[in-house]
Design a protein with these regions (language model features):
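Short alpha-helical DNA-recognition segment
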Residues: 22-41
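Residue register of alpha-helical TPR repeats
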Residues: 78, 117, 156, 196-198, ...
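DNA major-groove recognition helix of helix-turn-helix/homeodomain DNA-binding modules
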Residues: 52-67
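A short, Lys/Arg-rich alpha-helix, primarily the initiator
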Residues: 1-21
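Residue signature of alpha-solenoid helical repeat architecture, marking inter-repeat boundaries
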Residues: 74, 111-115, 152-154, 192-194, ...
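"A position-specific structural signal for the A-helix of alpha-solenoid helical repeats
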Residues: 82, 114-122, 159-160, 167, ...
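Single-residue signature of alpha-solenoid repeat helices
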Residues: 96, 135-136, 174, 216, ...
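Amphipathic alpha-helical segments of tetratricopeptide repeats
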Residues: 100-107, 140-147, 179-189, 221-232, ...
């Protein structure tokens, strides 16, 4: 399970004042959340090494976590979006949608790239977590625009607009956005390997959906090349699965690739993709499995 950990600067006296107002001692407030010494550091030294701890304390005290943070607002937003992203990777888009609804920030205090990152995740979770295509398109189109040069999140938003059109079965429009996004991606793929792997997978999945298996295989291999080049395991189980599926559809050997995808999905405890991999293996290789057992 991914954890949301970062050292943040806080206003410790806000915690102390709320605790005293509720007539709770440090031991009672800290119980089940953190050590008493950690709480003391929060209240007296304005240091919190785990943002989840701060959230839990604020929930117990019934105060807003934003009121206790003095860190640069962009750092707070980036941390919050990391949590949203972690949920999306596990295909927990409904939870991600609920998480991003809790994020409050002023656009005046954050840079353009971070705003475009927020708009991308807001659009993505509206689409896949709330099934609100109109809201999703609004955020994604805003997220795809830039007056100061493209950011990686502008490109991600373009890619996600492709996903929206794909879900609407408007495949010609989806193809326009997918192709445009991966064209722009060439300038970013090694600098932002995680985001590149996400987009190559999405694009491969689309081409697989419209039965252009050669293109799908090509994009899945592009994603795997980035993963190898940058030593990242991000989206690895998805890319391996997509490669295996399209190899099978092209009547090429695919069992070993499916086994690799299965291994990594199990390792990362990604139950979402694991179900698809197991179903394919059972369907595509049942006869060979039975022969091996004889």
């Amino acid at each position: 399970m991914c954890e949301w950990r970062i050292a943040v600067k806080i206003i410790g006296k806000k915690i102390k004042e709320a605790r005293k107002a509720k007539k709770i001692n440090q031991k009672s407030l800290a119980e089940g959340i953190c050590s008493q010494s950690a709480l003391s550091n929060i209240e007296n030294k304005n240091i919190c090494k785990d943002f989840d701890v701060l959230i839990a304390l604020c929930e117990r005290l019934e105060i807003n976590v934003e009121d206790c943070i003095t860190e640069v607002e962009s750092q707070y937003l980036d941390n919050a979006l990391k949590k949203v992203n972690a949920l999306c990777i596990q295909l927990k888009h409904k939870e991600a949608y609920q998480a991003i609804k809790q994020i409050n920030f002023s656009q005046k205090n954050v840079n353009k790239e971070l705003i475009s990152k927020f708009l991308f995740f807001k659009g993505l979770t509206s689409l896949l977590g709330n099934n609100d295509q109109e809201e999703a398109l609004n955020y994604l189109l805003k997220g795809s625009q830039s007056d100061q040069g493209l950011t990686i999140y502008n490109v991600l938003s373009l890619n996600a607009v492709g996903t929206l059109h794909e879900l609407q079965k408007n495949y010609s429009q989806a193809k326009v956005y997918y192709d445009k996004s991966v064209q722009f991606l060439e300038n970013f793929k090694y600098k932002y390997p995680q985001e590149a792997c996400r987009m190559f997978y999405n694009t491969a999945k689309f081409y697989s959906e419209i039965k252009e298996y050669e293109n799908a295989l090509n994009y899945s291999e592009k994603g795997l090349e980035v993963a190898r080049h940058c030593s990242t395991s991000y989206f690895l189980e998805y890319l391996l699965y997509e490669k295996a599926y399209n190899l099978y559809k092209l009547d090429q050997p695919a069992k070993e690739d499916y086994e690799q995808a299965l291994l990594f999905a199990k390792y990362f405890q990604n139950e979402g993709i694991l179900t698809y991999i197991k179903n394919d293996i059972d369907t595509f290789f049942r006869n060979s499995t039975e022969e091996n057992q004889m």
